[in-house]
Amino acid sequence: MALLEICCYSMECALTAQQNGADRVELCAAPKEGGLTPSLGVLKSVRQRVTIPVHPIIRPRGGDFCYSDGEFAAILEDVRTVRELGFPGLVTGVLDVDGNVDMPRMEKIMAAAGPLAVTFHRAFDMCANPLNTLNNLTELGIARVLTSGQKSDALQGLSKIMELIAHRDAPIIMAGAGVRAENLHHFLDAGVLEVHSSAGAWQASPMRYRNQGLSMSSDAHADEYSRYVVDGAAVAEMKGIIERHQAK
């Protein structure tokens, strides 16, 4: 049966995902940045209360995946922290200036991760040559690759995802970006073994007082009084679709 991973941005969201049938959580901060490394406090609280596998993302900033020496040092330190806290896996990825896997740096990450299952995230979708990259990731011992098939959403990239799945002895190919209940059957019919979804929505803040003339973001039009949360009903619906597909 296909595995359902839910992207979560808080302990509360991780618990919601767990309660509604998620098989695994990718734990992140900063949804508007596409997911950054969670704080130590969030990591510890999730480790204590969530019982399904949780894989934190290790990504020090938004934007591309070519990092300075200081950023890479932080990545290694965060990898060690996640390992010390007892998480079963993590999510990360580093490219060089030419859009190839930065093999020396990824080798250091794999050494720091030790026995943890490492997912190479959507840095894959920004690489120059996906098949060469997949070969490099196989050589590194990467457990899985999260990809939209190098398109803006995974449904558009499904043909590339199927091509990657057919690659012999490669890591697990996990489809992500825009995967929802309404299109999930396309991925299941294509033989995708793992799917990744945020299964969420923006929720209004409970604050009654609101200073509408102030933004805490560099985006002056950002809504400071909303937060991204996992929709438990959406998770349960996706899990049900997977189970019914398996029963066919």
UniProtKB/Swiss-Prot annotation:
Presence of the UniProt keyword Cytoplasm in the record = yes
**Known InterPro entries for this protein?**
CutC-like, CutC-like_dom_sf
Mention one GO molecular function. copper ion binding
The entry's keywords: Cytoplasm
- SUPFAM superfamilies, alphabetized: CutC-like
GO cellular component annotations, sorted alphabetically?
A: cytoplasm
Q: Where in the cell is it found?
A: Cytoplasm
Query: Where is this protein chiefly located?
Result: cytoplasm
Q: Which HAMAP family match?
A: CutC (MF_00795)
Which PANTHER family does the record match to this protein?
A: COPPER HOMEOSTASIS PROTEIN CUTC, COPPER HOMEOSTASIS PROTEIN CUTC HOMOLOG
For this chain, the family text in UniProt reads: Belongs to the CutC family.
Q: How does it assemble?
A: Homodimer.
Please state what the protein is called.
PF03932 family protein CutC
Name its species. Answer: Escherichia coli O127:H6 (strain E2348/69 / EPEC)
Q: What is the lineage of its organism?
A: Bacteria, Pseudomonadati, Pseudomonadota, Gammaproteobacteria, Enterobacterales
